[in-house]
From Swiss-Prot:
PANTHER family: RIBOSOME MATURATION FACTOR RIMP
Disulfide bonds: none
Encoding gene per record: rimP
Function: Required for maturation of 30S ribosomal subunits.
Taxonomic placement: Bacteria, Pseudomonadati, Pseudomonadota, Gammaproteobacteria, Enterobacterales
Originating species: Enterobacter sp. (strain 638)
Main location: cytoplasm
Cited NCBIfam families: PRK00092.1-1
Similarity section: Belongs to the RimP family.
Location in or out of the cell: Cytoplasm
Annotated CDD domains: YlxS_C
Membrane spanning stretches: none
The protein's name: Ribosome maturation factor RimP
Amino acid sequence: MPFFYVLGVGLSTLEQKLTEMIKAPVEALGYELVGIEFIRSRTSTLRIYIDSEDGINVDDCADVSHQVSAVLDVEDPITVAYNLEVSSPGLHRPMFTAEHYTHYIGEEVAVVLRMAVQNRRKWQGVIKAVDGEMITVTVEGKDEVFALSNIQKANLVPHF
């Protein structure tokens, strides 16, 4: 099960520590740290999402990976073996902050909640509004309001 870190609102001390350690090096290279995802499993994964105004290519990911690896090797915050992945947010862009939702008002989003609302954890609809830490999504013509803290995972739904 993935653990997400919303910049500014951490799920755990580890996610906070990781973001504090890698945010400055990522930004020093000229990229935005969109968010991180730490997936705990038999082979754990630390996934770092980066972006820039010019987009992201493989060389950008490699540069950030080398820089972040060096920081993590020195600080050694993760006590289990893990794989490091660096990528762009991609077409199914993950949403981490209230600002991300605000930027994509009018776009379709798939949301997985930590705790069910109306006996449902999975929702898909159009982002209508953001009010502080509350996100309004229009689902089948009806507005549903979710607390950002209750969102386990959310991604844009691309249309082709």
